[in-house]
Amino acid sequence: MEHPSTNYTPEQQHEKLKHYILIPRHLWCYIKYGTHVRYYTTQNVFRVGGFVLQNPYEAVIKNEVKTAIRLQNSFNTKAKGHVTWTVPYDDISKLYAKPDAIMLTIQENVEKALHALNQNVLTLAAKIR
């Protein structure tokens, strides 16, 4: 059963993708359990996604085995409205993941180091003149 699509304006999509990182396709298989993802289908339909339940996941779809990502809308499997669904990698054009605290710390440290490096380059350039 396919979930009915909710249409989001480009502005709403942009807002929902704040703090999410576009993941290159060759790294999709490394997105771990519990990570929240959002994605665009190959038909360019924006989906708000869910939490990774299994990834990669070998799904049989129309008698064909496909590599997929299995998602859920919550961690409480007994909660009313809890659903899981499978999305084959081939049906995804763009996949975004919400980084955890470790990744945010790494990103912040890299940005600080890059800023310091840029300052050093500017200082050296000024001395050369």
UniProtKB/Swiss-Prot annotation:
Gene Ontology biological process terms from the UniProt entry: symbiont-mediated suppression of host innate immune response; symbiont-mediated suppression of host type I interferon-mediated signaling pathway
UniProt entry keywords in alphabetical sequence: Host-virus interaction, Hydrolase, Inhibition of host innate immune response by virus, Inhibition of host interferon signaling pathway by virus, Interferon antiviral system evasion, Viral immunoevasion, Virion
Highest taxon of source: Viruses
Top-rank EC class of the record's enzyme: hydrolase
Protein name (database record): Uncharacterized protein C129R
Protein purpose: Plays a role in the inhibition of type I interferon signaling pathway. Mechanistically, specifically interacts with 2',3'-cGAMP and cleaves it via its phosphodiesterase activity. In turn, prevents 2',3'-cGAMP interaction with host ER-resident STING1 leading to inhibition of downstream signaling pathway and type I interferon production.
Molecular-function annotations in GO: hydrolase activity
